[in-house]
Amino acid sequence: MRKRISAIIMTLFMVLVSCNNGGPKLKSDEVAKSDGTVLALAKISKKIKDASDFATSVKEVHTLVKSIDELAKAIGKKIHNDGSLTTEDGKNGSLLAGVHSVISAVKTKLGSLEQKAIGEFAGMKVQVVAIKTASIDLLNKFKDKNAELGKNEVSNDDAKAAILVSNTTKDKGASELEALNTAIDGLLKAANGAVEAAITELTVPVKVEKPSQNN
């Protein structure tokens, strides 16, 4: 995304510089189009970069959360000697420990993301805090269900109730994980929207006011 945005900005800069002949006097970081509209490139470029950086951080968290769906496919499985997965029921303790580690990393990243949710992204801070709370709720559920989940011989049914969001029974963490998925989807959509809004400023510039003819 960063490379694409940089290419957009550089291309636009080269095109608009050629249109600066005549018209109102511009600041050093502004360029004007032939129709009299002006773009403050430095300001718009910073907005795009900041929005892109924030969205990238959100995407990292989103990827971690969604990775649990893939891990859930390994419930009741082990690696066969031919490289494929084969059945091994009731040995899901290490798998759940791995999921716990992923969610702990999510919680840490959300703490950092919360510090970035300032300025133009302050409106998303509530979402970030809600997602961090959802991650804590999931970790707490794992702790509460330690008798069933905190051992090597975790049954397939208990593992599914913990990390398989499509499972019918979700009383060991899957319900909290489902809420976490929904929340991070919403934040990613909002973050991407901020990027699009910043880019839109390139195509919807502010019109330069012409000098009054009454002087």
From Swiss-Prot:
> Lipidation, kind N-palmitoyl cysteine: residue numbers?
C19
Q: Where does the record say this protein resides? A: Cell outer membrane
- Main subcellular localisation: membrane
Instruction: Give the membrane topology, semicolon-separated if more than one.
Output: Lipid-anchor
Q: Pfam families recorded for this chain?
A: Lipoprotein_6
Specify the superkingdom.
Bacteria
The further comment given in this record reads: Genes for both Vlp and Vsp families are on (usually) unnamed linear plasmids in B.hermsii HS1.
Per its record, how is this protein called by name? Variable small protein 13
> What gene name is given for the protein in this entry?
vsp13
